């Protein structure tokens, strides 16, 4: 792994408005998230219970980003939130932890994804011990 030699935070960067000859239609803000998944805008929502459920994931997907449905609910409800997004034929992510209790969640969501030919499973690598 290459060591990070410099890092910036939001406070380190300031964007100053300035006149430009470049038109918005000439700008490409897309990002290749995976080999087969390209987003129109480089925006992924946080997989937090106060941030992303179906409504937010729909709004972000319509804008060209990716909403990631949080995992702080039972598996059935998480799949219901995913279905809300998929009903509108949009892409969506689903957060799944890495702890032993999360394997069942991953299996159920993977089965749903494979059965319904869906897009993406988003993994959060967080162990169960981080919450205890």
How should each PLM-predicted stretch be described?
Residues 1-43:
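An N-cap/entry alpha-helix motif that binds or orients negatively charged groups
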Residues 20, 25, 30, 45-46, ...:
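Generic serine detector
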């Amino acid at each position: 792994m290459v060591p990070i030699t410099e890092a910036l935070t939001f406070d380190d960067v300031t964007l100053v408005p300035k006149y430009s000859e470049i038109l918005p239609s000439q700008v490409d803000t897309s990002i290749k998230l995976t080999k087969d998944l390209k987003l129109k805008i480089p925006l992924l929502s946080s997989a937090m219970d106060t941030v992303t459920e179906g409504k937010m994931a729909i709004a972000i997907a319509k804008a060209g980003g990716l909403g990631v449905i949080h995992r702080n609910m039972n598996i059935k409800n998480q799949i219901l939130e995913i279905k809300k997004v998929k009903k509108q034929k949009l892409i969506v992510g689903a957060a799944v932890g890495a702890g032993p209790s999360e394997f069942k969640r991953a299996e159920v969501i993977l089965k749903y994804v494979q059965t319904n030919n869906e897009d993406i499973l988003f993994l959060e690598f967080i162990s169960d011990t981080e919450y205890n």
